[in-house]
């Protein structure tokens, strides 16, 4: 049972961390679902990027959960649950283009509104380390949005497997490299279909 005294008087940051934790946890599961759809539609690389982003969100959620438990200790809150209002749950599940659009919208909201607002509140409450952590997570979400935008552009323009000029395509299964505007229908090295090719991009 939640103690009403603490619900009314707990720091706003504790509520915000809980909202963010819920959001990151849900995003992780959505991206996992989106990865399966991308794979079914022949977008192997996009599927992997969804899974990579899901893992990023898992890491965010882990840190948020840690910060929540630390604040509970600080304020001597023994309750086993925190009640928060105003949590919206995205339920978009469409094709890859639709899923990318929904992902872009979510990531944009997080890095332009949610995390900056939550960080400012935390700083006002004297929780600078938490504020810094929230701003850092926001930077990661900005990167997610930028990456999803690039992928959406390619899906909508039909250029995932077709470029204007010859580029190097690398097979994601065996590493074979092909030079051309499009990848081969089948990898001559391992026989995997063209959906396993991606543009070679290596900067070390």
UniProtKB/Swiss-Prot annotation:
Q: Where is the signal peptide?
A: none
Q: Does the keyword Manganese apply?
A: no
Q: Name one GO molecular function term.
A: iron ion binding
List, alphabetically, the InterPro entries matched.
Ferritin-like, Ferritin-like_diiron, Ferritin-like_SF, Rr_diiron-bd_dom, Rubredoxin-like_dom, Rubrerythrin, RUBY_RBDX
Question: Where in the numbering of this chain does the Rubredoxin-like domain appear?
Answer: 166-204
> Where along this sequence does the record place binding of Fe(3+) 3?
171, 174, 187, 190
Ferritin-like diiron domain location is 1-159
Which portions of this protein are annotated as coiled-coil regions? none
GO cellular component annotations of the record: cytoplasm
Q: Which PROSITE patterns match?
A: FERRITIN_LIKE, RUBREDOXIN_LIKE
Co-factor note (free text): Binds 3 Fe(3+) ions per subunit.
Localization of this protein: Cytoplasm
Name what cofactor the protein needs. Answer: Fe(3+)
| Its biological purpose | May provide oxidative stress protection via catalytic reduction of intracellular hydrogen peroxide.
Q: Which NCBIfam families match?
A: RuberyRbr
Q: How does it assemble?
A: Homodimer. Possesses two rubredoxin-like centers and two non-sulfur oxo-bridged di-iron centers per dimer.
Its name, as the record gives it, is: Putative rubrerythrin
Task: Provide the species name.
Answer: Methanocaldococcus jannaschii (strain ATCC 43067 / DSM 2661 / JAL-1 / JCM 10045 / NBRC 100440) (Methanococcus jannaschii)
What high-level taxonomic lineage is stated for the organism?
Archaea, Methanobacteriati, Methanobacteriota, Methanomada group, Methanococci
